[in-house]
């Protein structure tokens, strides 16, 4: 609301992307549907990241291609990822044997419904919006999303049977060094792995 007050020759506005990223951590433990590479690929193709940025973040940001922003020397546009392609996601699932045999709009394979348990938390106000947006677009490709938005996320994530996808927000390189992210999220003894 105070922005117009600064619109004059006495002020110069500049901006730079931060390393804050909204990302999905997928559960590779036995029993999770995310052990299926086709499901992981379909999730990546079935979430409208561009729409999330434009509509829910009001254009404040851009879809990430990886863990780090495009301007960094160690990520961003050097990484490729799936783009939003609902029809392509449906094809990936069909080819992997996930079909809607009972006509309810949700795919099944070997008697198992394609449902993902989506864990997130409310303290980053965008995360529940991301969950609802993903729930809508993934339903369009035949994936049912059960959202658990809880402040107790750090306890819930310890139970591998309680989640398939964990949506988080994090500053990925707070010191400008990518090692932080790998130390916290990616190594086998990482605190958030």
Regions found by a protein language model. Give the residues of each.
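Active-site-proximal beta-strand/loop segments in catalytic clefts of secreted hydrolases
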Residues: 16, 29, 56-59, 68-71, ...
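Acidic-aromatic pocket-rim loops
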Residues: 154-193
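Ligand-site clamp/hinge motif
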Residues: 1-5, 144-146, 151
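Append "and occasionally in soluble cytosolic enzymes with long acidic Gly/Pro-rich linkers
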Residues: 35-136
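Extracellular/periplasmic solute-recognition and catalytic clefts
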Residues: 1-30, 54, 63, 169
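Short alpha-helix C-terminal cap/hinge motif
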Residues: 133-145
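Short glycine-biased active-site loop of nucleotidyltransferases that positions the nucleotide triphosphate
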Residues: 14-15, 109, 156-160
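Beta->alpha turn/N-cap motifs
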Residues: 1-2, 49, 68, 169-173
């Amino acid at each position: 609301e105070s922005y117009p007050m600064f619109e004059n020759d006495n002020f110069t506005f500049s901006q730079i992307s931060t390393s804050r990223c909204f990302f999905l951590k997928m559960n590779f433990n036995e029993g999770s549907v995310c052990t299926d590479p086709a499901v992981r690929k379909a999730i990546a193709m079935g979430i409208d990241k561009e729409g999330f940025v434009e509509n829910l973040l009001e254009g404040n940001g851009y879809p990430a291609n990886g863990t780090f922003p495009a301007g960094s020397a160690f990520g961003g546009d050097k990484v490729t990822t799936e783009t939003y392609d609902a029809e392509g996601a449906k094809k990936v699932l069909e080819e992997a044997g996930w079909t809607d045999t009972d006509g309810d709009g949700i795919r099944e394979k070997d008697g198992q419904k394609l449902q993902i348990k989506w864990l997130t938390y409310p303290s980053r106000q965008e995360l529940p919006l991301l969950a609802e947006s993903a729930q809508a677009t993934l339903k369009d490709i035949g994936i049912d999303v059960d959202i658990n938005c809880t402040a107790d996320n750090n306890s819930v994530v310890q139970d591998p049977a309680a989640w398939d996808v964990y949506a988080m927000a994090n500053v990925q390189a707070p010191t400008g060094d990518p090692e932080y992210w790998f130390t916290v999220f990616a190594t086998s003894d990482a605190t958030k792995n």
